[in-house]
Structure formats: C-alpha cells, structure tokens
C-alpha cells in the first residue's frame, strides 16, 4: 500500500512540474547603459499616454512584457520593476504619477504627467522625469496630432 501511495505521489508530482515552471516565469533585465534614465524613455511614455483610453490601459501598456521599452530595475533584483499609475485631480488639472514598485508597500516615483485644460478648452500635457533618475528639469511636452481619447476619460461624463 505504501508503494502504491508513493507511486501516485511521484506520478502526480511529475504532472505538476510544468505548471510550477510557468508560475515562476521571470523577466531578465539587461541594462542598456549605466544611466538608469535610459531604461525608461519618457517620449515613449508620452506616446503610450496618448494611445491609452484610460489610466488602467495606460498602466497595462507601460507593463507589457513583450515591449522592451521599460527596462527599469531600481531595486537591483534582476527583474523589471512593475510600474503603477496613480492619479489625483483638482478641477481642470490632473496629476498622473508613475511609480516603480520596489517591494511590498515601497514605491519610487519615476515620472509625473501634468494634464491641464485651460479656459479655452486647450489641453497641455507635460511629462516630467523624477529628478533623482532624470536630473533636473527633464520635461517633455508632447504634441498630439489627434486629441487623445484619455482626455475624454478625464473630462467626459461619468456615471456612478
């Protein structure tokens, strides 16, 4: 009886090995240079922001594993850091902060996106790199050919 139990246990373990291997999938970081600011291009961040329909999709675009545009490893664990997106708003101004998740409840600001609509309904977007990573006054002001859909998400009607 003991041998039958061990045989079934061994056989069951063999079937579980492929699933365990898939659960431990990691992404290896290969730094493009010693300058960490080159591992996240803020022009690409501005482009992805303009392509997103809302902040949830923007966060998903930032963290797409198949794209090699984000290669940040700020905590040095050998894996690409997940980038989370948080937002605060005040009237016609929105602040979107991109943070690298370093550990549980530990975050590092990477960039901020200021979105503001003036009295003439003109929207200004500024992507500002964190001073620690990008140096002082690293600001990108994207010009979009078409109005990004995310503007509607910021100022469109909302239903509760």
Where do the model's predicted regions map?
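Extracellular/luminal recognition modules and glycoprotein regions
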Residues: 32-35, 41-64
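Low-complexity segments
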Residues: 99-160
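Boundary of Sec targeting at the N-terminus
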Residues: 23-25
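Extended, structured, electrostatic nucleic-acid-contact surfaces
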Residues: 64-70
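C-terminal segment of classical bacterial N-terminal signal peptides
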Residues: 14-21
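Acidic, glycine-anchored loop motifs typical of Ca2+
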Residues: 70-82
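Bacterial N-terminal signal peptides that target proteins for export
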Residues: 1-8
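Basic, polyanion-binding surface patches
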Residues: 94
